[in-house]
Amino acid sequence: MAGECVTLTCFRFDGTLERVRQFGRMGLDRRPLARTPDIGFHRMMGTGTGLGFRPRPNFGVWTILAVWPSAEIAQERTESAPVWRRWRARAAEDATIFMETLTRRGEWGGEAPFTPREPAPALRQGEKLAVLTRATVKAARAGAFWSRVPAIEDALAEARDVRFHVGMGEVPWLHQVTFSVWDREEDMAAFAHAAGPHREAADDAFRRGWFTESLFARFAVIGSAGRWRGAALGF
């Protein structure tokens, strides 16, 4: 499929030794990742505990988000590029989600990382919806922001038709990235916009100026590879 492709690869590591090794690789592999042929915007990120959204790090799960010129190149690089092969060789399991951008609002580190596909940015029949949010939290507001997370996690656990979710970040406490995959856009909208903890936290964040930067992006899921929690994602 022509056009830009965004990938999110999640790796799970078991055992203290493998987790310590992977923590070290987060520093060692930054330059090798940047030298990967055809890679555009990219981030290596850790994840949180609970359902993934809490600020306390989960040293067992690490992720790579990357932008590629096409889905074909994305598939080839996430299978064979040195960083992916190195992480995969040590991981208990890994899975990659392939996406095309529908919409993007805001910036990430001063960059506009995702380019919406053409023509009209809408889901095609059979495509699932992925949503990514990213925020830089003001240090003085971090406590207020993170205090809302447990209630949001409880609501997400009860949400209809959410197929995958993970919380990530570059710096614990100060950066939060949320990612989720939904069967239908209507179910995502019901979770995000209906009265409840997520809506209340979002309203307070913008009304009270909790963030120095924020981004919201929607994607069409066009494929997946690998296994997660013992099963193929099936996207």
Question: Which role fits each region the language model picked out?
Answer:
Residues A81-A89, H198-E200:
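A common structural junction motif
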Residues E200-W210:
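C-terminal end-helix/capping segment
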Residues Q22, W84-W87, R207:
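Generic structural signal of hydrophobic/aromatic residues within well-ordered alpha-helices
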